[in-house]
Swiss-Prot record:
Binding site for Mg(2+): 320, 326, 329-330
Gene name as annotated: pheT
Keywords of this entry: Aminoacyl-tRNA synthetase, ATP-binding, Cytoplasm, Ligase, Magnesium, Metal-binding, Nucleotide-binding, Protein biosynthesis
Reaction catalyzed: tRNA(Phe) + L-phenylalanine + ATP = L-phenylalanyl-tRNA(Phe) + AMP + diphosphate + H(+)
Leading EC class: ligase
One Gene Ontology cellular component: phenylalanine-tRNA ligase complex
Cofactor field: Mg(2+)
Assembly behavior: Tetramer of two alpha and two beta subunits.
UniProt-recorded name of the protein: Phenylalanine--tRNA ligase beta subunit
InterPro entries named in the record: aa-tRNA-synth_II/BPL/LPL, B3/B4_tRNA-bd, DNA-bd_dom_put_sf, Phe-tRNA-ligase_IIc_bsu, Phe-tRNA-synth_IIc_bsu_arc_euk, Phe-tRNA_synthase-like_B3/B4, Phe_tRNA_ligase_beta2_arc, PheRS_beta_core
NCBIfam families xrefs: pheT_arch (TIGR00471)
GO molecular function: ATP binding; magnesium ion binding; phenylalanine-tRNA ligase activity; RNA binding
Localization annotation: Cytoplasm
PROSITE patterns with a match to the protein in the record: B5
Length: 545
């Protein structure tokens, strides 16, 4: 999770309260305090609460929680004549763009630092390191609308941020620090995404760098926002968070028309919640009026619409609200967890460590001793990573997400090795060798199982290394096994082995197939090992999902 730095003076000014009160209540709105310094406090929030990754967002939540200002904050959007055109040649490159104008904003140094902070946090949390979403903020008064978002040749040149000379797009990708960091996102594309104004001035080369021409300073009064990406929902989420942050900072929002679509849409989402369901989940006895009052503290619009129903308006920046239970969680936060009465269970029982968990703990120690680093990949994945890239048939018993928030999170993982390969892809420019492992849950047929996966990449990675690692692991665990030739299409034929224990297949190891490596865009050889831990304890029941 990114660490958010909250300067006391700016936060006190926005909240209207002293720093001690702020620090005392920060944990109550969901933050972990990392450091308390002389001029600022550094905090962490869950990645789902992207609206809290700015001083303005924290101040908005704090004012509500302390009942200094309750209910929804209204975000008016005035019409403007500013337009964006998007060229067709970006359809397979970076097709989506969101935009808005912020006028009459007063930016001091602290506000600019906060703006840069939320921009980078959104790049990390929503944008997946700018691959999915990238944000540009520009001084509108230095350019002339209408604007054009198009695919340009690599020979196009402009002066990038922090430089005083023109550079071609190729030079920027090779020489500019941001180019070296992010060029891998677009360098293999047929054209480069570029934003320019009516006079041909370049505003931005997303997702890499803005132009020096539109640098934002304390004298900037009118801002143009651009959010580009490969996922439309993520683009609009980032745009809404950015717009509401700047409105809270004192700006005034105007619309931009992008290929005929007027944006941003900052209107709230409407929903009814059931009072009985909320109380049952939380173990409370709140009335509809009490729940409405609590939700107003959490910056919802809320009114009682019946004895058992509350009508709510969900703020546009709350991209994390996907189910009624998300709202119920806010009821618990707003009421204060300390005010919820704890109850002892009616029955008493003693617990013990599950054998598979004990095995997983021992495996972590063994893998670390073998020189492998433990990683924690996401539980949610998608068909492309799980099956298509691995050259495997889809699992018909996989658990799919009914309403996925993005194309990258459409099912619960059924294997671990594909996720390790995806991590190696993301770190392929890091120093070699890379040896990683993970032991954790997978889900199939509504059952939760424990698996182990290891992966190693370097120029000399081969079958002998995979065999030696597996043999050492099984020997340390005291498990006898027999190797049998594997037909797993994720591995090179003749260089992969099934792990057989008591006549049953418990796993597989070998050299990853070049076709798989190509699909993951990995340049070096990789060996992989995957073991079903639950099969080592056939008498143990799996966990119901």
């Amino acid at each position: 999770m990114p660490v958010v730095s909250l300067p006391y003076k700016y936060l006190e000014r926005l909240c209207g309260i002293d720093r001690k009160t702020i620090i005392d209540h920060l944990p109550m709105i969901g933050s972990d305090i990392e450091r308390i310094l002389e001029d600022q406090v550094d905090v962490e929030f869950f990645p789902s609460r992207v609206d809290l990754y700015s001083t303005e967002g924290v101040a908005r939540a704090m004012r509500g929680f302390l009942e200094l200002e309750t209910g929804e904050e209204v975000y008016p959007v005035s019409p403007s004549s500013i337009t964006f055109s998007v060229d067709e040649n970006l359809k397979e490159v970076r097709p989506y763009i969101g935009s808005a104008v912020i006028r009459d904003i007063q930016l001091d140094n602290e506000a600019i630092i906060s703006l840069m902070g939320v921009q980078e946090a959104l790049h990390w949390v929503v944008g997946r390191g700018r691959a999915k979403v990238a944000i540009g903020v520009h001084d509108l008064d230095k350019v002339t609308p209408p604007f054009r978002y198009y695919g340009a040749p690599v020979t196009r040149s402009f002066i990038p941020l922090d430089y005083d000379r023109e550079m071609t797009l190729t030079e920027i990708m090779e020489e500019h620090p941001k180019g070296r960091d992010y060029s891998h996102i677009v360098k293999d594309k047929p054209v480069m995404p570029l934003i320019e104004d009516a006079n041909g001035n370049v505003l931005s080369f997303p997702p890499i760098i803005n132009g020096e021409l539109t640098r934002v300073t304390e004298s900037s009064k009118n801002l143009l926002l651009d959010v580009t990406g490969t996922d439309e929902r993520a683009v609009m989420t980032a745009l809404r968070v950015l717009c509401t942050t700047l409105i809270t900072a004192g700006g005034r929002c105007e619309s931009v028309t992008v290929n005929g679509v007027v944006m941003p849409d900052l209107s709230p989402a409407l929903r009814n919640i059931n009072v009985t369901s909320c109380n049952k989940l939380l173990g409370t006895s709140f009335s509809a009026d009490e729940i409405a009052t609590i939700l107003k503290k959490m910056r919802y619009g809320a009114e009682k619409s019946g004895d058992s129903t509350v009508s709510i308006r969900i703020p546009c920046y709350r991209a994390d609200i996907m189910h009624e239970w998300d709202v119920y969680e806010d009821v618990a936060i707003g009421a204060g967890f300390g005010n919820l009465e704890a109850e002892l269970p009616a029955t008493f029982a003693t617990g013990c460590e599950h054998p598979i968990i004990a095995l997983a703990s021992a495996i972590r120690d063994i893998c670390s001793g073998l020189g492998y680093l433990e990683v924690m990949p996401f539980t949610l994945s998608n068909e492309d990573v799980m099956y298509t890239r691995m050259q495997r048939e889809p699992d018909p018993k996989a658990l799919h997400v009914l309403h996925p928030i993005s194309e990258e999170q459409t099912l619960v993982r059924t294997d671990l090795l594909p996720l390790l390969l995806d991590l190696l892809r993301m770190n392929k420019r890091r120093e070699l060798p890379q040896r990683i492992f993970h032991t954790g849950d997978v889900v199939s047929s509504m059952q939760t199982y424990q698996k182990l996966a290891l992966a190693s990449t370097h120029p000399g990675a081969d079958f002998s290394e995979a065999y030696a690692t597996t043999d050492a692991l099984m020997r340390e665990l005291g498990i006898s096994y027999l190797p049998a030739e594997s037909a797993d299409p994720a591995f090179i034929p003749g260089r992969a082995v099934d792990i057989m224990v008591d006549g049953k297949k418990m796993g597989v190891f070998g050299e990853i197939h070049p076709g798989v490596l190509n699909k993951f865009d990995i340049d070096q050889p990789v060996i992989g090992i995957e073991i079903d831990l639950h099969l080592l304890f056939p008498g143990q029941k799996e966990t119901k999902s």
